[in-house]
From Swiss-Prot:
Molecular-function annotations in GO: glutamate-5-semialdehyde dehydrogenase activity; NADP binding
Catalytic activity as recorded in UniProt: L-glutamate 5-semialdehyde + phosphate + NADP(+) = L-glutamyl 5-phosphate + NADPH + H(+)
Name of the encoding gene: proA
Keyword Oxidoreductase: yes
Family according to the record: Belongs to the gamma-glutamyl phosphate reductase family.
Pathway involvement of the protein, from the record: Amino-acid biosynthesis; L-proline biosynthesis; L-glutamate 5-semialdehyde from L-glutamate: step 2/2
UniProt-listed NCBIfam families: PRK00197.1, proA
Organism, scientific name: Synechococcus elongatus (strain ATCC 33912 / PCC 7942 / FACHB-805)
UniProt function note: Catalyzes the NADPH-dependent reduction of L-glutamate 5-phosphate into L-glutamate 5-semialdehyde and phosphate. The product spontaneously undergoes cyclization to form 1-pyrroline-5-carboxylate.
Family matches, as CDD domains: ALDH_F18-19_ProA-GPR (cd07079)
Protein name: Gamma-glutamyl phosphate reductase
C-alpha cells in the first residue's frame, strides 16, 4: 500500500504540473483541443461501444442491479449526445481570466479579482462511462487536471474513452498527464488521501458510495448523497398537463438522480387526478406505494415511513396525499435531499410560495424535474450536481470548476500611507 501511495503521489504531481501547463493555454487553444477530442471520440466510437458491450455482458453475468446497468449502458445515441456536449462546451466563453472585480483603491493602485483553475480534480464515479467524457472536457475547458476513477463494472469503457482522449491530447501537443485514469479500489483509497495534490473530490454514484467518500477524505467534496426529488400536485393543477409531467419525471430515466421518488397530491384534487396518473404510470411499468388515503382511491402497495426517505432509482414511486401546500412543503423539507423539487399548479401565488419556501438546489413549476442537468441548463456539460448550501449549487458546470485570485497592481504604494492620524483615504472606485 505504501508503494502504491508513493506511485499515485508521483502521478498526481504530474497531473498538477500538466494542469498548470494547460491553464497557460489560450481560450482559443483549449477550444481547439476540445474540438479535436470530440472528433477523435467520434472516430473511436466503434471501439468505445464494443468496450461498453463487454462491460455490460460481464455486469449481466455478475447480476448487476437494473439501476446500475442503466447507468453503465452506453449506446450510440448516448455517446453521440456526450460528444455533442463536448462541442457545445468548446463554444462557451473561456472561464479563465474573467475580471469579476476591477477597482481603483487609489490613484495607480488597481485591484482585480480574476478567475483561475481550481487545480486537480479527483472524480470518482460508479458505472457512468459517459461521465468520463463530461468530466475530462470540463476539466480541459477550465484549465484543470483530472484524476478519474470509474467503477470496476465500467473499466473497459473508461479505458477506451480515456485512450481516445489521450490520443487527441498527444496529437495537439497538449500534456497527456492532464487526464489520468485509475482502475483499482486501492487507488481510490490512496487518492482520497492526496490532499497535497488534489484540490477537489467529486463523487458520482449511490448514496452509500458518496457518503463513503465524504467520510474518508480531508479534501473538499462536491456532490450529493441522495436524489430524493418530489412533485407536488396542487389543488389548482391542470390534470392532463400534470399527468404528462409526472410520467416524464418518473419514467424518462428512472435511474437518474433527478427522477422523482415521491408524488405529493393535494387531497382536494386526488380523486380526479390519482386514478388518471396511476393508469398512465402503470402503462410504463411503475409500481406505486401509497399512504392510507391514496390506497382508498387506487389500490396500491402500502407505503412505510422508509419510503419517504428512499431513492429508488427504479420504476417505483411513493404517493402521499396532503391537506395543503404548507403540508407539501413541510414534507419536502423534511424528507427531501435538497436536489430538485417541483410543483404543478395554475395558481401563481402557490408557485411563488413553493419557490420561496422549498429549500432545494432546484425548484420547478409545471415542468419535469428531469431538466436538472448541466447540458439542459446550457452549461455544455456538468461535472455533477451539488446539494450543498454554499456555491456551487445544483448542476455544476464550468463556473463550479474555477476559483479566483486577487491581483493588486501599484507603483510603490505602502499600507502606512493609509493608516494613522494623517491617513490618506481610499478611492474605492470601480472602473
Amino acid at each position: 500500500m505504501a508503494t502504491l501511495s508513493v506511485d499515485l503521489e508521483v502521478q498526481a504531481q504530474a497531473t498538477r504540473a500538466a494542469a498548470r501547463q494547460l491553464a497557460q493555454w489560450s481560450g482559443a487553444d483549449r477550444q481547439r483541443l476540445l474540438s479535436a477530442i470530440a472528433t477523435t471520440l467520434e472516430q473511436e466510437a466503434p471501439r468505445i461501444l464494443a468496450a461498453n458491450q463487454a462491460d455490460c455482458e460481464a455486469a449481466t453475468t455478475e447480476g448487476i442491479a437494473p439501476a446500475l446497468y442503466a447507468r453503465l449502458k452506453l449506446d450510440a445515441d448516448k455517446l453521440a449526445a456526450a460528444i455533442a456536449g463536448v462541442r457545445d462546451l468548446a463554444q462557451l466563453p473561456d472561464p479563465l481570466g474573467q475580471i469579476q472585480i476591477d477597482r481603483e483603491l487609489d490613484e495607480g493602485l488597481i485591484l482585480q479579482r480574476l478567475t483561475c483553475p481550481v487545480g486537480v480534480l479527483g472524480v470518482i464515479f460508479e458505472a457512468r462511462p459517459d461521465a468520463v467524457i463530461q468530466i475530462a472536457s470540463l476539466a480541459i475547458k477550465s484549465g484543470n487536471g483530472a484524476i478519474l476513477k470509474g467503477g470496476r463494472e465500467a473499466i473497459c469503457s473508461c479505458q477506451a474513452i480515456v485512450a481516445a482522449i489521450a490520443q487527441a491530447l498527444a496529437e495537439q501537443q497538449a500534456p497527456v498527464e492532464a487526464i489520468r485514469l485509475l482502475t483499482s479500489r486501492e487507488e481510490t483509497l490512496a487518492l482520497l488521501k492526496l490532499d497535497r495534490y488534489v484540490d477537489l473530490i467529486i463523487p458520482r454514484g449511490s448514496n452509500s458510495f458518496v457518503r463513503f467518500v465524504q467520510d474518508n477524505t480531508h479534501i473538499p467534496v462536491l456532490g450529493h448523497a441522495d436524489g430524493i426529488c418530489h412533485l407536488y400536485v396542487d389543488q389548482a393543477a391542470a390534470i392532463e398537463k400534470t399527468v404528462t409531467i409526472t410520467v416524464d419525471a418518473k419514467t424518462q430515466y428512472p435511474a437518474a438522480c433527478n427522477a422523482i421518488e415521491t408524488l405529493l397530491i393535494h387531497e382536494a384534487i386526488a380523486p380526479q387526478f390519482l386514478p388518471v396518473v396511476a393508469a398512465a404510470l402503470h402503462e410504463k411499468g411503475v409500481s406505486l406505494r401509497g399512504d392510507a388515503a391514496a390506497q382508498t382511491i387506487v389500490p396500491m402497495e402500502a407505503a412505510t415511513e422508509e419510503d419517504w426517505r428512499t431513492e429508488y432509482s427504479d420504476l417505483v414511486l411513493a404517493v402521499r396525499l396532503v391537506p395543503s401546500l404548507d403540508a407539501a412543503i413541510a414534507h419536502i423539507n423534511e424528507y427531501g435531499s435538497g436536489h430538485t423539487d417541483a410543483i404543478a399548479t395554475e395558481d401563481a401565488a402557490a408557485a411563488a410560495q413553493f419557490f420561496s419556501q422549498v429549500d432545494s438546489a432546484g425548484v420547478y413549476h409545471n415542468c419535469s424535474t428531469r431538466f436538472a442537468d448541466g447540458f439542459r441548463y446550457g452549461f455544455g456539460a456538468e461535472v455533477g450536481i451539488s446539494t450543498q448550501k454554499l456555491p456551487p449549487r445544483g448542476p455544476v458546470g464550468l463556473e463550479g470548476l474555477v476559483t479566483y485570485k486577487y491581483v493588486l497592481s501599484g507603483d510603490g504604494q505602502i499600507a502606512a500611507t493609509y493608516s494613522g492620524a494623517q491617513a490618506k483615504p481610499f478611492l474605492h472606485r470601480d472602473r
